[in-house]
């Protein structure tokens, strides 16, 4: 599959220590700012249809607003029940203050 870097957001639109939801090529993505780095995952929880961008970000962990399961936003790893499936992550790079995602 061909992967392309896609412009997802302005870096300034992602508050420090917070999460925002964006739509990239029709797909919902959550963007996180953690200790000066930007991370990206699917925006929908793997357990339910909750948006991760509505969740609570604490350090590297995002808590799903529906059932309080937690994911590591850097790796996508599901950290506790009721989650059993990891969340998809996307490579990120910053170019000219734009957040670029590598998507399939």
From Swiss-Prot:
Gene: nagAb
Domain Rieske span(s) in chain numbering: 6-101
Molecular function as annotated in GO: 2 iron, 2 sulfur cluster binding; metal ion binding
Cofactor(s), names only, from the UniProt record: [2Fe-2S] cluster
GO CC annotation, single: catalytic complex
Origin species: Ralstonia sp
Pathway this chain belongs to: Aromatic compound metabolism; naphthalene degradation
Similarity remark: Belongs to the bacterial ring-hydroxylating dioxygenase ferredoxin component family.
Positions contributing to [2Fe-2S] cluster binding: 45, 47, 64, 67
Cofactor remark: Binds 1 [2Fe-2S] cluster per subunit.
Oligomeric and partner information: Ferredoxin NagAb belongs to both the salicylate 5-hydroxylase (S5H) and the naphthalene 1,2-dioxygenase (NDO) multicomponent enzyme systems. The NDO multicomponent enzyme system is composed of an electron transfer component and a dioxygenase component (iron sulfur protein (ISP)). The electron transfer component is composed of a ferredoxin reductase (NagAa) and a ferredoxin (NagAb), and the dioxygenase component is formed by a large alpha subunit (NagAc) and a small beta subunit (NagAd).
Domain of life, per lineage: Bacteria
Pfam annotation, one family: Rieske
Disruption phenotype: Cells lacking this gene are not able to convert salicylate to gentisate.
UniProt keyword terms in alphabetical order: 2Fe-2S, Aromatic hydrocarbons catabolism, Electron transport, Iron, Iron-sulfur, Metal-binding, Plasmid, Transport
Name by which UniProt lists this protein: Naphthalene 1,2-dioxygenase/salicylate 5-hydroxylase systems, ferredoxin component
Stated role: Component of two multicomponent enzyme systems which are involved in the catabolism of naphthalene. Plays a role as an electron transfer component for both salicylate 5-hydroxylase (S5H) and naphthalene 1,2-dioxygenase (NDO) systems, by transferring electrons to the oxygenase components.
Gene Ontology biological-process entries: electron transport chain; naphthalene catabolic process; salicylic acid catabolic process
Entries under InterPro entries matching the protein: Rieske_2Fe-2S, Rieske_2Fe-2S_sf
